[in-house]
C-alpha cells in the first residue's frame, strides 16, 4: 500500500517542526510554531492495516494518530534557546566604518538572517562565510574610489568631473570579509573598521572628492592651480598639456604627488 499512501500524501499538507525564523515586521528572530499536517504516516498505516488483516476485518479506520506529526514542538527548550541566542548574536545593525568615522555600509538584521542557519541536530548557530564574502565584495565595489568618476565644486565655483588615475581608496576585501565574519560569529559587536590596501586623505563616499590639498590641472583652461587643504589658492600658472592625439594627450584622473 506504499504507492497508495504516497499518492494520497501528494495532495495533503505536510507537518513542520517548530523552528527559528526571522520576522521582518518585528525585525527580530522569533519562534515559528510547529504545523500539524494531513499526510499519512506510512509506518503507522501499514501497522494498522496489518492488525486489521490479522483480525479478518474488512475495513480499517485511520485517525489523526496515523498522521505524520512534527518532531519538534514549540515547548522544546532548545528552540526557545536558539531564538534567544540568534537575537543576542546580532544587534539592531552592524556598521562598516571607513577612515575611522565614516559609515560606508550597514548590515541590517534581514541581511544577517539570510546568512544564519540553525542545525536541526543540536540547534547550534552558524553563519555562512561565503554569504558574508559575497556581500562584502559587492559593497566594496561601491566603496573603492581608485579610478572612479568624481564630481566636486572647485574652490572658484567651477563644477568639475574627473575619472581615472591611481589615487584613492581601495578596500582589502579578503581582510574585510574575514573581519566581518569573525565579528558576527563572536556576537555583540556593532561595527568593524574597513581595512584598505590603499587610502586617500578623506572619504566622502564613492563619486565625491577624497583629497585635501591638491594641484588642479585644467586641460580645457590650460591652467594649474594649487589649493591647500582649507581651499586657499596658493599658486596659479599657465601650463601646456599634451597634444590631444593618440599617444600624446595628457591622461586625466587623480594621482598622488
Residue spans of the language-model regions?
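Surface-exposed, secretory/extracytoplasmic low-complexity segments enriched in Ser/Thr/Asn/Gly/Pro
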Residues: 1-257
Amino acid at each position: 500500500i506504499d504507492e497508495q499512501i504516497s499518492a494520497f500524501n501528494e495532495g495533503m499538507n505536510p507537518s513542520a517542526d517548530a523552528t527559528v525564523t526571522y520576522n521582518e515586521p518585528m525585525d527580530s528572530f522569533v519562534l515559528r510554531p510547529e504545523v500539524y499536517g494531513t499526510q499519512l504516516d506510512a509506518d503507522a498505516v501499514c501497522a494498522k492495516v496489518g492488525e486489521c488483516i490479522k483480525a479478518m476485518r474488512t475495513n480499517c479506520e485511520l485517525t489523526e494518530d496515523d498522521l505524520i506529526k512534527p518532531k519538534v514542538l514549540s515547548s522544546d527548550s532548545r528552540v526557545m534557546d536558539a531564538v534567544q541566542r540568534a537575537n543576542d548574536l546580532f544587534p539592531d545593525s552592524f556598521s562598516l566604518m571607513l577612515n575611522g568615522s565614516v559609515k560606508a555600509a550597514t548590515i541590517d538584521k534581514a541581511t544577517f538572517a539570510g546568512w544564519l542557519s540553525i542545525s536541526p541536530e543540536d540547534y547550534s548557530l552558524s553563519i555562512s562565510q561565503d554569504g558574508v564574502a559575497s556581500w562584502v565584495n559587492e559593497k566594496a565595489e561601491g566603496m573603492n574610489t581608485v579610478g572612479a568618476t568624481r564630481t566636486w565644486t572647485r574652490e572658484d565655483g567651477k563644477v568639475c568631473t574627473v575619472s581615472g588615475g591611481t589615487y584613492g581608496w581601495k578596500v582589502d576585501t579578503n581582510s574585510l570579509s574575514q573581519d566581518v565574519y569573525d565579528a558576527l560569529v563572536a556576537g555583540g559587536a556593532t561595527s568593524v573598521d574597513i581595512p584598505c590596501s590603499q587610502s586617500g586623505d578623506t572619504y566622502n563616499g564613492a563619486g565625491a572628492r577624497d583629497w585635501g590639498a591638491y594641484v588642479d590641472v585644467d586641460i580645457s583652461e590650460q591652467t594649474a592651480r594649487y589649493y591647500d587643504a582649507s581651499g586657499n589658492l596658493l599658486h596659479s600658472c599657465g601650463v601646456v598639456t599634451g597634444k590631444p592625439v593618440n599617444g600624446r594627450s595628457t591622461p586625466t584622473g587623480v594621482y598622488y604627488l
